């Protein structure tokens, strides 16, 4: 492993960790940054699976007490059972559509122009959602009904379009469906666990031939870096939303998306030549 490869792994691990749970699209940022770093091909596909696992481990650690309570209470406690059922209900729509459309979406939509467009559109929707009056009926994740869970799960399917953001879709969807800002954010984190682990297992098995022992040092750098920076991002977001809206993230999405589109329009960067 040379120094440049290690630097690529470090940078992409940081990008994954910081963006995975913020409503700004980690996949979109990965596509753009990986293209700028000229990090692509089969190794990149395997690398992305590993760093996503590093990011999800950060959420598991952050909410370990809640997870442990649910696991212990699952056999006897209705609250734990209801929470688990709601999580499964929210998880299923992405599973079904992911299996059907994943390859098609990866082939045609995994490019910086799609990402930039989705960033801008998603940012505008986020601003609109934040300015609407919301009638909140779920103040905690335990107040969520199965209908709420299904709606959030359907909203998560929009994140199959790169640049949309899985967390952005579920959080904003949650706000529109009557969840408090804190509840929508926490449920988005919990929903990320089965969704991302399921996607990683599916992709890991499908592309198992890409994992080579020589790449393990690169994977280790990305995994650890993604874990550390995801921890920072999760803690920071939970603290931020206690007193702020998501408007700042919406404006960031719009500005970043317009910047990418401008560099393409004026010919400064040939994004159309980018490969996933």
UniProtKB/Swiss-Prot annotation:
It is an enzyme of class 3 (hydrolase). Pfam families: BacA (PF02673). It comes from the Bacteria. Keywords: Antibiotic resistance, Cell inner membrane, Cell membrane, Cell shape, Cell wall biogenesis/degradation, Hydrolase, Membrane, Peptidoglycan synthesis, Transmembrane, Transmembrane helix. Signal peptide: none annotated. The keyword S-adenosyl-L-methionine does not apply. It is found in: Cell inner membrane. One of its GO terms (molecular function) is undecaprenyl-diphosphatase activity. It is a multi-pass membrane protein. It catalyses: di-trans,octa-cis-undecaprenyl diphosphate + H2O = di-trans,octa-cis-undecaprenyl phosphate + phosphate + H(+). GO terms for biological process: cell wall organization; peptidoglycan biosynthetic process; regulation of cell shape; response to antibiotic. The keyword Transcription does not apply. Its EC number is 3.6.1.27. The chain crosses the membrane at residues 43-63, 85-105, 109-129, 184-204, 218-238, 254-274. One of its GO terms (cellular component) is plasma membrane. Belongs to the UppP family. Bacitracin is thought to be involved in the inhibition of peptidoglycan synthesis by sequestering undecaprenyl diphosphate, thereby reducing the pool of lipid carrier available. Catalyzes the dephosphorylation of undecaprenyl diphosphate (UPP). Confers resistance to bacitracin. PANTHER family: UNDECAPRENYL-DIPHOSPHATASE. This is Undecaprenyl-diphosphatase. It comes from Pseudomonas fluorescens (strain ATCC BAA-477 / NRRL B-23932 / Pf-5).
């Amino acid at each position: 492993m040379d120094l440049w490869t290690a630097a690529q792994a470090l940078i992409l691990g940081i990008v994954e960790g910081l963006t995975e749970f913020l409503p700004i699209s980690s996949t979109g940022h990965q596509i753009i940054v990986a293209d700028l770093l000229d990090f692509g091909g089969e190794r990149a596909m395997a690398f992305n699976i590993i760093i996503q696992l590093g990011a999800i481990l950060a959420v598991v650690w952050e909410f370990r007490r809640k997870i442990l309570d649910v696991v212990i209470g699952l056999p006897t406690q209705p609250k734990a059972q209801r929470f688990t059922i709601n999580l499964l209900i929210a998880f299923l729509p992405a599973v079904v559509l992911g299996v059907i459309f994943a390859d098609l979406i990866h082939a045609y939509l995994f490019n910086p122009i799609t990402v930039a467009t989705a960033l801008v559109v998603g940012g505008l929707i986020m601003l609109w959602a934040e300015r609407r009056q919301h009638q909140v009926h779920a103040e905690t994740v335990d107040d969520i009904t199965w209908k709420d869970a299904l709606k959030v799960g359907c909203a998560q399917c929009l994140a199959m379009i790169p640049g949309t953001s899985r967390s952005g879709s579920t959080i904003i969807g949650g706000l529109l469906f009557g969840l408090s800002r804190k509840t929508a954010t926490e449920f988005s984190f919990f929903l990320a666990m089965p969704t991302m682990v399921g996607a990683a297992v599916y992709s890991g098995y499908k592309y198992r031939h890409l994992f080579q022992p020589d790449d393990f040092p690169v994977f280790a750098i990305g995994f650890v870096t993604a874990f550390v920076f995801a921890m920072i991002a999760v803690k920071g977001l939970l603290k931020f939303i206690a007193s702020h809206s998501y408007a700042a993230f919406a404006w960031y999405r719009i500005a970043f998306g317009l910047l990418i589109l401008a560099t393409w329009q004026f010919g400064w960067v040939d994004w159309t030549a980018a490969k996933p």
